[in-house]
Amino acid sequence: MIDNILFDLIEREAKRERENIELIASENFVSSDVRQAVGSVLTNKYAEGYPSKRYYGGCSVVDDIENLAISRAMELFGASYANVQPHSGSQANMAAIMSLIKPGDKILGMELSHGGHLTHGSKVSFSGMFFDAYSYGVSRDSEMIDYDDVKNIAKACRPNLIIAGASSYSREIDFKKFREIANEVSAYLLCDIAHTAGLVATGFHNSPIDVAHLTTSTTHKTLRGPRGGLILAGKEFNTMINYNNKERTLDSAVNSCVFPGTQGGPLMHVIAGKAVAFKEALNKEFKDYISRVIENTKAMAEYFISEGLRIVSGGTDNHLFLVDLSGLGITGADAEKILESVNITLNKNAIPFDSKNPSVASGIRIGAPAITSRGLNRDDSIKVAHFIIRALKTKSTDELRKIKQEVIGFISSFDMP
């Protein structure tokens, strides 16, 4: 029996995606091959454990699939080790953190309101509940990471683990400087490249793989794969560490912390989708795509600046940027609602040293991965920025209706992947 109610809802979502300009920096559109893999019969298979070490029979095919995903991930990032089982970036971070340190140890991560992530020490996350969390932020003047300040904080709190990475920071992060700081205070270094993995894989950003003890990522966002997580290691993969009161290699500790430590059976259909996405990212076309993402992001940021709006840190080096809306006299929450009414989707976002509650926020976050996947170029991206400014400045309901129709007509001319 066909579930008409559910499939009608899915079709409504497909229509929404076709007719909306998608600017949420953490979202993207996967290929039909990725969707086919994720929607395959592999969803039927339980496969607790790892290839050749399963707790169930009938795993020979999924062993080959997981090994394929692992080998492609290692090739893509130049890694010596990869675990493709984490269900999400947050679960990848949980496993990575808990393989390196124990509950009660000290973590130093980027302040959430300055661009960090919940799993980097926020009190509402496991990382802040189970660990003694400290934070670093950006300079009030430059709104960029001040590495001397990070060093001073690290010397003061002596963390067991330093986390480098962000969810709303528009500048390239110097992972080598973070490793120097970690070495100085005898801390482990975890680099979270969930947002910039596509830029790292294609060489547009420096790679932390052989710099950090562990690197984590999501497999969606700029990697354009299915929603999921990934843990990588470079030359530190066989470093001996104390895990659960036993001396073992880092890769072995991570494997144990993913399963059985924090997860049960892996999602084999999603791992297959990851394998497809890694293969796609190894092609030259993907590097061209990331180049266009960066170009489109910079074009939008520059247009906002030319129209008198302030961009946090003055610009962007990656796939996203933050707009301070204080000059327009509206909040991020206001802007999110206004723009959704004209079929432009993005999110409200706190800006550094924001005086407003995060649920209201003074800014918005804008990203170009999804629109670039639909084929928008630099000029198209500037047009998108123009739509946004028109919508945020108008006081006319009729004008908003007009903008919505223009947006639908414009974005509908671009195919979905």
Curated annotation (Swiss-Prot):
Its keywords, alphabetically, are: Amino-acid biosynthesis, Cytoplasm, One-carbon metabolism, Pyridoxal phosphate, Transferase
Q: Which reaction does it catalyse?
A: (6R)-5,10-methylene-5,6,7,8-tetrahydrofolate + glycine + H2O = (6S)-5,6,7,8-tetrahydrofolate + L-serine
Q: In which pathway does it act?
A: One-carbon metabolism; tetrahydrofolate interconversion; Amino-acid biosynthesis; glycine biosynthesis; glycine from L-serine: step 1/1
Which Pfam families does the protein's record reference?
SHMT
Residue positions annotated to bind (6S)-5,6,7,8-tetrahydrofolate are: 112, 116-118, 247
Q: One GO CC annotation, please?
A: cytosol
| GO terms, molecular function | glycine hydroxymethyltransferase activity; pyridoxal phosphate binding
Instruction: Give the cofactors, semicolon-separated.
Output: pyridoxal 5'-phosphate
Record PTM N6-(pyridoxal phosphate)lysine, positions in chain: 221
- Indicate the annotated site residue(s) for Plays an important role in substrate specificity: 220
Q: Which GO terms describe its biological process?
A: glycine biosynthetic process from serine; tetrahydrofolate interconversion
Q: What is its EC number?
A: 2.1.2.1
Instruction: Describe the task this protein carries out.
Output: Catalyzes the reversible interconversion of serine and glycine with tetrahydrofolate (THF) serving as the one-carbon carrier. This reaction serves as the major source of one-carbon groups required for the biosynthesis of purines, thymidylate, methionine, and other important biomolecules. Also exhibits THF-independent aldolase activity toward beta-hydroxyamino acids, producing glycine and aldehydes, via a retro-aldol mechanism.
What do we know about how this protein assembles, alone or with others? Homodimer.
* Protein family: Belongs to the SHMT family.
* Annotated protein name in UniProt: Serine hydroxymethyltransferase
> Gene name on record?
glyA
